[in-house]
A protein has these predicted regions:
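Non-catalytic, polymerase-adjacent accessory regions of viral genome-replication enzymes
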Residues: 1-140
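Duplex nucleic acid-engaging cores and interfaces of nucleic-acid transaction enzymes
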Residues: 146-148, 154, 173-203, 212, ...
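A contiguous, low-structure linker/loop signature
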Residues: 121, 126-170, 181-189
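Non-catalytic, well-ordered alpha-helical scaffold segments
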Residues: 75, 79, 91-94, 98, ...
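Conserved polymerase palm-domain catalytic core
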Residues: 156, 198-202, 206-344, 349-357
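Conserved aromatic-histidine-acidic binding/catalytic patches
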Residues: 62-65, 69, 171-179, 183, ...
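Short, flexible loop/turn elements at secondary-structure junctions
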Residues: 100, 166, 177-179, 208, ...
């Protein structure tokens, strides 16, 4: 705020005022006028000072959370889960998974990953929620505590069709409601380290710290020393043809988490206002679905190696898998019937129709 004191008219000083308003105060000593040039922004600051909106304070509180410390806390427990899984200590794995899922740090991180970090956060499920305010995120972190999970049917997923990259075809996505996505993210944080300790080294799809470039490098390292025949296979409808009961048995997790995953798998699909039950597969679009598909396909390399004919046992074949794309590398051609018979035993959790492998 600036003050101009003297016997000047308002018209005389107005050209020098770039912003704000002019107010005059008549003084008692001879009528000398003091003209005040008041900045409007200063007035707004004064008027709003101490009157901060609740949403602003919640946003500040959310952003000021010690996220690095929370992530480190989760990572420490995940490392313990990984080591216990490596040693085959199932009871310790389940105890640590429960500890992680009940911790406030993991619940806050799970909500943040779904509502803030995830690229698909703006895609709504049937609940219609596209964005979540900071105060609602705190409430979600409290709601997804495992002790508050209700063991009843979940809301169905919303069917969305998106184009396949480089193709004219479209693939379906099943988008769960926002709160279910947060629960799935929390469950994934617990299950992922357990299964990372079990997964085959040549599996690269939907795994932390791995990419398609790593899969290409693995194939190159295999074929550069010796010539190899490469069989390119694509498991069609891998998400849609997973046998849910076999998958649940393969997970071998504790009852509460098993029931939650069973509810998500059988939530059903809502498309164009019509409900369809899901008796097979896992929705492609759920937070936990890629991990469940990797669990279903786990053991494929071992099954193919064991099913390899003894007449070709000079050098066992190698398998490089990225999600449902498989590269089978071998030093000789295997008869088609033998390959087909080995593929039928690749995974006990997949029920593939004839001609879909």
């Amino acid at each position: 705020m600036a003050l101009i004191e003297g016997r000047y008219s308002e018209q005389a000083i107005r050209p020098y005022v770039s912003c704000g308003t002019i107010a005059s105060e008549a003084q008692a000593d001879g009528g000398t006028a003091v003209w005040k040039i008041v900045n409007k922004s200063d007035e707004r600051k004064k008027s709003t000072k101490g009157e901060r909106k609740p949403s602003d304070s919640a946003s500040e509180a959310w952003n000021n959370l010690p996220w690095r410390k929370l992530e480190k806390h989760c990572y420490r427990i995940q490392k313990r889960i990984y080591r216990a899984s490596q040693r085959g200590k199932t009871r310790a794995v389940h105890t640590l998974e429960k500890l992680l899922m009940k911790s406030e740090a993991a619940r806050l991180v799970a909500v943040r990953r779904v509502t803030q970090d995830n690229q698909g956060k703006k895609t709504a499920g049937i609940d219609g929620i596209k964005s979540v305010k900071p105060q609602e995120r705190f409430a979600m972190a409290d709601t997804i505590h495992p002790t508050r999970w209700k063991q009843h049917a979940s809301q169905p997923v919303r069917r969305v069709w998106i184009p396949k990259p480089g193709k004219a075809e479209q693939r379906p996505l099943g988008i769960p409601p926002m709160i279910e996505r947060c629960k799935q993210a929390l469950a994934k944080m617990a299950l992922e380290p357990e299964w990372e300790a079990k997964f085959e080294p040549n599996s690269y799809g939907f795994r932390p710290g791995r990419s398609c470039h790593d899969a290409r490098e693995a194939i190159f390292n295999i074929i550069r020393s010796k010539p190899k025949f490469v069989l390119d296979a694509d498991i069609k409808g891998a998400f849609d043809n997973i046998c849910q009961e076999k998958l649940l048995n393969k997970l071998q997790t504790y009852p509460q988490l098993r029931n939650a995953i069973k509810i998500w798998l059988r939530a059903g699909v809502m498309a164009n206002g019509e409900f369809s039950p899901t008796e097979m597969g896992t929705p492609q679009g759920g937070v936990i679905s890629p991990l469940l598909m990797n669990v279903a396909l786990h053991g494929m390399e071992q099954a193919i190696t064991e099913g390899y004919s003894k007449s070709h046992a000079v050098e066992k074949p190698l398998l490089v898998r990225y999600a449902d794309d498989v590269r089978h590398l071998t030093h000789c051609l295997i008869p088609l019937e033998e390959r087909r018979s080995s593929e039928e035993t690749t995974s006990g959790s997949l029920d593939l129709p004839e001609g879909e492998s």
